[in-house]
Curated annotation (Swiss-Prot):
The lineage of its organism: Bacteria, Pseudomonadati, Pseudomonadota, Gammaproteobacteria, Enterobacterales. Keywords: Cytoplasm, Glycosyltransferase, Purine salvage, Transferase. The keyword Protein biosynthesis does not apply. Gene3D superfamilies: 3.40.50.2020. It catalyses: AMP + diphosphate = 5-phospho-alpha-D-ribose 1-diphosphate + adenine. The keyword Nucleotide-binding does not apply. GO terms for molecular function: adenine phosphoribosyltransferase activity. The gene is apt. GO terms for cellular component: cytosol. Pfam families: Pribosyltran. This is Adenine phosphoribosyltransferase. PANTHER family: ADENINE PHOSPHORIBOSYLTRANSFERASE, PHOSPHORIBOSYLTRANSFERASE DOMAIN-CONTAINING PROTEIN. It is found in: Cytoplasm.
């Protein structure tokens, strides 16, 4: 087993599965258990950063809230700035917003209007790719400000929920450390 394979195994083993959370029939993949394991957390940051080290990026964007936990250290590892995307009303300067559809309604995200400049090459980082709605809204915000997004990076991909297909449909390739193909 290579060093990278060992790191990926450690990361996957550190993610606890919680049955029937947040509702019956759901098998929740708990990334907070990965955060509790310093070796697994460090490995996840190192692998994500290494994957995009030579990609010519200028900014890392992370979505509230767990995207901050992975996006910020990846940005630091790459020597780049980090831009948070937050729920409405949480950012102090002038923002733009994007609404997106949830299973039972809609939600919204905001980004500072001056955080991305035309031509910025942006990597979106989040803990988990599920349906892709949050990340698509994030990509729309970045593109509205003139940023270029070709990739999004995740610790976990719940492939059975179709997020990767949705991202591909808007021209964004996804990279994940750990794939969970089914419930």
């Amino acid at each position: 087993m290579t060093a990278t394979e060992q790191q990926l195994a450690l990361i996957k083993q550190s993610i606890k599965s919680v049955p029937d959370y947040p509702k019956p029939g759901i098998l929740f993949r708990d990334v907070t258990s990965l955060l509790e394991n310093s070796r697994a957390y460090a490995a996840s940051i190192a692998l994500l950063a290494d994957r995009f080290r030579d990609a010519g990026l200028t900014k890392i964007v992370g979505t509230e809230a767990r995207g901050f936990l992975f996006g910020t250290p990846v940005a630091l590892a790459l020597g780049l700035g980090f831009v948070p995307v937050r729920k409405p009303g949480k950012l102090p300067r002038e923002t733009i917003s994007e609404n997106y559809v949830l299973e039972y309604g809609t939600d919204g995200l905001e980004i500072h209007k001056d955080a991305i400049v035309p031509g910025d090459k942006v990597l979106v980082v989040d803990d988990l790719l599920a349906t892709g709605g949050t990340i698509c809204a994030t990509v729309k915000l970045i593109r509205r400000l003139g940023g270029e997004v070709q990739d999004a990076a995740f610790v976990i991909n719940l492939a059975y929920l179709g997020g990767e297909t949705l991202l591909n449909s808007i021209g964004v390739a996804s990279y994940s450390l750990v794939l969970f193909p089914g419930h």
